[in-house]
Amino acid sequence: MAGAKEIRSKIASVQNTQKITKAMEMVAASKMRKSQDRMAASRPYAETMRKVIGHLAHGNLEYKHPYLEERDVKRVGYLVVSTDRGLCGGLNINLFKKLLAEMKTWTDKGVQCDLAMIGSKGVSFFNSVGGNVVAQVTGMGDNPSLSELIGPVKVMLQAYDEGRLDKLYIVSNKFINTMSQVPTISQLLPLPASDDDDLKHKSWDYLYEPDPKALLDTLLRRYVESQVYQGVVENLASEQAARMVAMKAATDNGGSLIKELQLVYNKARQASITQELTEIVSGAAAV
């Protein structure tokens, strides 16, 4: 059994670590609330944009935009949103596992996959497993802007425009609540039709002014950008929630470990006192 002094040192070490994890839990909780506010502010725009685009997919368009047309799939692209920092439980690895499983279904069909990474954890992971990373952006902090994200988005849209990509997806964690974040893979291009049953039984006609091509070019690009930005802010809220939960679990585990060490310390101290008493009694008996 370890000595009492060594056990006291371990208890002090765990207590110091517990203070750190508790502070990180509180910081993550504060950042999560701010991230939730940003997510709530951007979600109505993203959802309305998705609804408008869903109307277009069901509409009788006088100009058929390339983003609305299905192609034979030879290469697909993924915009992957991960975190820049760790200590957020299984948030990243669960997302990566889901993506790897989907990529395998494509590669089994002879389809190649390109990856545009947002977040350093995704960059390091997919470089280590041999993924074809064609664009990346990292270090966006806790308040990302669209201008910081636009690089990888432009790379993938250009590849799609030039016919080098036939499908484009966004991969990110969807924030459900503090305890639940769901890894999701959503198709961006070609434009997915809305799931709204009412739309499937209606014919949508639009009048474009001044020019349908110019309007759709701008609108559909803005749609992709809005979905990517929404994915990033939701992933950020998911990151802070996962980190808060992970740090709370670490703090609670530290408390349990301290109790166990305190029990061991008490036993060691009791054994030491018993030994000293035995030695005193033995010495007195010898006299």
From Swiss-Prot:
Q: Which GO terms describe its cellular component?
A: plasma membrane; proton-transporting ATP synthase complex
Compartment list: Cell inner membrane
Q: Which GO terms describe its biological process?
A: proton motive force-driven plasma membrane ATP synthesis
Taxonomy, superkingdom = Bacteria
A Pfam family recorded for this sequence: ATP-synt
Keyword Cell inner membrane recorded: yes
InterPro entries in alphabetical order: ATP_synth_F1_ATPase_gsu (IPR035968), ATP_synth_F1_gsu (IPR000131), ATP_synth_F1_gsu_CS (IPR023632)
Report keywords, A-Z. ATP synthesis, Cell inner membrane, Cell membrane, CF(1), Hydrogen ion transport, Ion transport, Membrane, Transport
A molecular function annotated in GO for this UniProt entry is:
ATP binding
Task: Quote the Gene3D superfamilies the UniProt record gives.
Answer: 3.40.1380.10, ATP synthase, gamma subunit, helix hairpin domain (1.10.287.80)
Predominant subcellular localization, coarse grouping: membrane
SUPFAM superfamilies of this UniProt entry? ATP synthase (F1-ATPase), gamma subunit
Q: Does the keyword Ion transport apply?
A: yes
Among PROSITE patterns, the record links this protein to: ATPASE_GAMMA
Kindly state the subunit structure of this protein: F-type ATPases have 2 components, CF(1) - the catalytic core - and CF(0) - the membrane proton channel. CF(1) has five subunits: alpha(3), beta(3), gamma(1), delta(1), epsilon(1). CF(0) has three main subunits: a, b and c.
Instruction: Describe its function.
Output: Produces ATP from ADP in the presence of a proton gradient across the membrane. The gamma chain is believed to be important in regulating ATPase activity and the flow of protons through the CF(0) complex.
Q: Which family does it belong to?
A: Belongs to the ATPase gamma chain family.
Question: Which NCBIfam families does this chain map to?
Answer: ATPsyn_F1gamma (TIGR01146), PRK05621.1-1 (NF004144)
**Protein name in UniProt:** ATP synthase gamma chain
Q: Which organism is it from?
A: Escherichia coli O139:H28 (strain E24377A / ETEC)
Gene name for this UniProt entry: atpG
